[in-house]
Structures are given as C-alpha cells and as structure tokens.
C-alpha cells in the first residue's frame, strides 16, 4: 500500500489506472469506514482512501482541533482491507492559498444539518470537488449515516457533469444499534449507555409510519420530547421524502427519518429509511 501526501506523486502513481474507487475520510477510522472500503473493492480494481480533516467544514465553535487524528493506526486498518493508495495531504497541500472559490450547494444544504452547522456543506462540497479533481475516480463511496451529505454529493456529481458513480454504503451499528461514528469516542461511559436512545426514538417513528400513522408533526414532536426528558439537547427529528429530502407528505412512498441531538458535549446523528405499507 502506498501512502502519498502530495498531489503530483499521486497523479504520477495513478497514470494507467482506469478503474478507481475512492473513499474520502477524515480519519479516526472504524468499522463503518472499513465497510465502505469493502464496497469500493466490489466496484473497481484500484481502491484509494483519503484521510484529511477538512477545516472548511468546521465552525469556529466545533471540534476541529479535537477531532481524532490517528494516521498510523488508520493506515494499518486500510492496508488490512486491501487499499492500494492512501492520500493523506497536509492542509497546505489542498489549500496552498486561502480558498476563495467555494462550491455553494443547493438550498437543501440550508436545512437539517445545514441549519445547525452553517457553512458545513459548503466546506464539504468544496473539498469533495477538489479531491474528485485530484483522484479522478470512476466510483466514490459515501455512507448513508451522513444521509444529507450523500444527497448533496450526488447532486454535486450530477450538476458538475462528473463521470463518477456515487455508491451509498449502509450504516454500520454497534451491537446495541448505536451508529458507528468517530465522535462516539467522546462519549463518557454513562453517556455511551444512553446514546442508543437516538436510534430507539427514530425506530419508534419508523414503526409508527410503517404501521399507518401519518401525523408526522406529532411523531417528530414526541420523539424530541422523549430525548429532552432523558437529557438530550435536540436539534431536529425530521421525516423527509427520501429522494428530495423535502418534508414528507402523507402520500409519499419512500421516506427517511433523520435526527441530530447533543448528549453532553457530543453531537450525534442518525437516520432510518422508511417504506410505508401500500394501502
């Protein structure tokens, strides 16, 4: 496995590669990331993973300085999974000058995560486009856990006419169904035991809708009340149409319920896809 930190040697290494699958990460890898690597291996011959903590997608009050940086450990995990190349640039490599040209996503970036993390998706879209231009993969794999991000990356590829297939990887969960996240390591022991409640309330919403309940506002409100009762500071629980992420309507078919809430100092997100029974 090659670990490359600069753009020019990466491009030299990629000469002649015509079947590339790319998995961008910020490091702090766990089984969720590794499942994306395995998906990438099923699609293309050469698998590239990037490790880069992107300052542009962090607000000044967020955890950029605290975010896990475990490059040596991450590279060992990636090598075990059969990754061919790790691209691990320094910040000055991707941003040699202040990034004045930014990718401004569609209005969907201003709702849900975008509402509570202003500028987040602008930073994500900008770095993803830069990485796509550097790596030039035929396939890129993103996880469904970051559901809104996946939607925006798909729109990015479509609207910029990028010849890249965007593959969605399923959310990987711990044995108690907590969605795996690099930020889970921030949780204290008692918080880790409580953290599964986010999945539980989303599951309850899913069951209600699949059982015929169409009082979406009531379901969202009840879910947030349950979380608040147990000490969570909830940003949103929201039922959306799956393909557009517009607020769900009673006649919609495929839906998704998304939630984001803070437990202590740790902000967690999760989502569950919903397929109502046909009447």
From Swiss-Prot:
Q: Which GO terms describe its molecular function?
A: ATP binding; pantoate-beta-alanine ligase activity
Q: Which reaction does it catalyse?
A: (R)-pantoate + beta-alanine + ATP = (R)-pantothenate + AMP + diphosphate + H(+)
Quote the InterPro entries the UniProt record gives. Answer: Cyt_trans-like, Pantoate_ligase, Pantoate_ligase_C, Rossmann-like_a/b/a_fold
| A Pfam family annotated for this UniProt entry | Pantoate_ligase
Which superkingdom, per the lineage? Bacteria
Residues annotated as binding beta-alanine are 57
**Principal cellular location given in the protein's record:** cytoplasm
Q: Where are the transmembrane segments?
A: none
Where does the protein end up? Cytoplasm
Which SUPFAM superfamilies does the UniProt record give? Answer: Nucleotidylyl transferase (SSF52374)
According to its UniProt entry, the function of this protein is described as: Catalyzes the condensation of pantoate with beta-alanine in an ATP-dependent reaction via a pantoyl-adenylate intermediate.
Name the PANTHER family on file.
Answer: CYTIDYLATE KINASE/PANTOATE-BETA-ALANINE LIGASE, PANTOATE--BETA-ALANINE LIGASE
- Family per UniProt? Belongs to the pantothenate synthetase family.
The name on file for this protein is Pantothenate synthetase
